[in-house]
Amino acid sequence: MEGVEKQGHRGPFMDSTPLIYEASLVDSPIICLNGRFLDQEMTGVQRYARGMLASLAPGLQVLRPKVPLSPARGHLWEQLVLPRRCGRSLLWSPGNTGPLTKANQVVTVHDASTLDHPEWFSGKFAVWYRFLLPRLARRVRKIITVSQFSKERLIATCSIPDHKIAVIPNAVDARFQPVSAEAIEDFRRRHRLERPYCLYVGSLEPRKNVSLLLKAWADLAPPDCELILAGTAGHVFREKGFTDLPVRTRLFGRVADDELPTLLSAARVFIFPSLYEGFGFPPLEAMACGCPVICSNSTSLPEIGGPEFDAADPASTGAVLYFNPTDREQLAHQIRRVMEMPPEEARRMSRNGIAWAGRFNWDRCASQTWAALKELALS
């Protein structure tokens, strides 16, 4: 059947993770997968969907467009073509959207940001999602979301009952782990990273609150350290009140997936000042690489980041320092605290982070998701 990913075949835009399917099960599927995400740019949603696709048990029929489509044409394919190709089988849509005409469907909705803060998005994008999500959430059989925070916001914004939403947290890919000193040294040399650095990884858009980080960094102005911003530049730099980058700040651009663990492992501290996250992959990925984390205390982030690090308590399992995302002085204080931290404290924070991130694995996430899908497919 057209659009089915079978064993040994990998379409364009796929990463290097093997896809494990048994042909006999693919030929007689009970669950179809909305594979539109396979042709989209890699973000947290696409990372989740690909991780799930690589980990799930056999039995999925992956339906995707024949060729990569523009966003507008992708929406048309999803709404008009996908439900016909799926037929009566259960459809799982892992990337926030799905066809409105398909009631026998499970949708993974990662957050309610378009409903809570439409001003953060382009006009057309916000209008479409504000029209689609509440109607889709009320029509389909089940919603999966990735945090208790997102569940509460979806209940409030979409007017759906508690029992219709299952919370299944995301996971951290196994490639995020501490790398060797030799690999770090080679990476530093190739990218001319001569000083110790603090790191932010993510898109540079208003809700990520990078402008607050830049202002806190300007207040600190540490002479022996630089701030690395890894991600695509956006209109955050045109916000009123901020026009120039502080000294010792470097725009690193987009990081290749295979280099991201090294970039994280080599950092002095990872800083995540986001105003709104349905889950938040980057802090957990940094923890998994042994990098100390400073994180906003907003939305889902305390739920995902776990207990705060307590240097005075040897039994503390915390791996993160939190701050109010509107308080630049508090952020500057936390950065200074990590930079002045005794080596043993930093190592303890690092060990705690590796242990905490280990709780979020794809096998657990996939098994819980598969159980929910199979129960609905057989009922």
Task: Go through each PLM region and give its residues.
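Carbohydrate transferase catalytic cores enriched for Leloir-type hexosyltransferases
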Residues: R10-S379
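Cationic, low-complexity basic patches in intrinsically disordered or flexible, solvent-exposed regions
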Residues: Q7
